[in-house]
């Protein structure tokens, strides 16, 4: 959020923030300077789900690509390219690595977007004088975008993993499906438990039938809406903090999608740099708690939450 709102504008790159579910608002925000639409499969921390097919339709009508952050969706739960997405990005630190040991990212190009026909991306069409006058669309074809990322951006920005971090992420990838299956199984059990707890006023988890995103979850994420979600406790920020401090198995850490279960207070940690207005716009409330459900025994995690909720 801060990258798009604060940092990139210093370099002349601006972003129009819109409601991902308001298609008229998205259409109205697109200008002749718009280069792409970007959204998350699952928003953080509310777990709202983007309608990928509709977003792809809008993007392609305007000859721009749809870029989706599928970090929470994971390649196991959702193949975004099946729904018209052009480029997928992931924080590999999360489910792909799986153990919170490395910082890294992934860009995956579907190869389906026609950069030349779009007319908005001369850097991929015209000869690149820094690389033997190669034309990425002419000489590379479907892999034009990802090749340009590797030969230009990787070379010029130095955003390269060390061999050891690459090894850790590749090792994590080997067990991705097995781990995510357990993550989701645990998350569903815990979300159902919390939804029926008298001291919990709200659970934001799209796999719950009560969620406004349930239908989209059934369409795009039938295996489960990941394992990161938020819930609100009865009371104030003080009550939320007391619950967090009383947990024994959950670690009070700001990362997510780790093998171990994690918990944070979003309003004062992950989103603590945001203004009150921005927090409200994102649906982040003082009494809200975010959990990232790990691979432990689900009954142990439920018991940990039960005891912590008794403290308020």
Model-derived regions: residue spans:
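Short, solvent-exposed polar/charged micro-motifs at secondary-structure junctions
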Residues: 26-28, 212-217, 262-267
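PLP-dependent enzyme catalytic core of the Aspartate aminotransferase-like
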Residues: 5, 32, 179, 245-246, ...
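Short, glycine-/Ser/Thr-/acidic-enriched flexible segments
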Residues: 112-113, 174, 210, 234-236, ...
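Conserved PLP-enzyme active-site core in the AAT-like
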Residues: 1-196, 204
């Amino acid at each position: 959020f801060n990258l798009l709102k604060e940092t990139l504008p210093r370099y002349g790159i601006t972003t129009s923030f819109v409601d991902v579910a308001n298609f008229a608002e998205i259409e109205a925000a697109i200008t002749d300077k718009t280069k792409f639409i970007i959204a998350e499969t699952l928003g953080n921390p509310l777990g709202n789900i983007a309608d990928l097919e509709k977003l792809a339709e809008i993007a392609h009508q305007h000859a721009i690509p749809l870029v989706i952050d599928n970090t929470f969706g994971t390649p196991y739960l959702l193949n975004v390219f099946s729904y018209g997405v052009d480029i997928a990005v992931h924080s590999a630190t999360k489910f792909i690595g799986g153990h919170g040991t490395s910082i890294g990212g992934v860009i995956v190009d579907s190869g389906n977007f026609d950069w030349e026909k779009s007319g908005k991306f001369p850097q991929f069409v015209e000869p690149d004088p820094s690389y033997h006058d190669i034309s990425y669309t002419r000489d590379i074809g479907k892999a034009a975008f990802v090749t340009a990322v590797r030969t230009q951006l990787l070379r010029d920005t130095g955003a390269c993993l060390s061999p050891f971090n690459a090894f850790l992420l590749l090792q994590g990838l080997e067990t991705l499906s097995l781990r995510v299956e357990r993550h989701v199984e645990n998350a569903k059990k815990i979300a159902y438990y919390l939804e029926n707890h008298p001291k919990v006023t709200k659970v934001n988890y799209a796999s719950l039938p009560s969620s406004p995103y349930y239908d989209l979850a059934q369409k795009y994420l039938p295996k489960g809406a990941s394992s990161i979600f938020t819930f609100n406790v009865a009371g104030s920020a003080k009550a939320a903090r007391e619950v967090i401090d009383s947990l024994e198995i959950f670690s009070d850490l700001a990362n997510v999608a780790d093998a171990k279960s994690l918990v944070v207070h979003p309003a004062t940690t992950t989103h603590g740099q945001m203004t009150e207005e921005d927090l409200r716009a994102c649906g982040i409330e003082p009494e809200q708690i975010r959990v990232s459900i790990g691979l432990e025994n689900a009954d142990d995690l439920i018991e940990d939450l039960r005891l912590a909720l008794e403290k308020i």
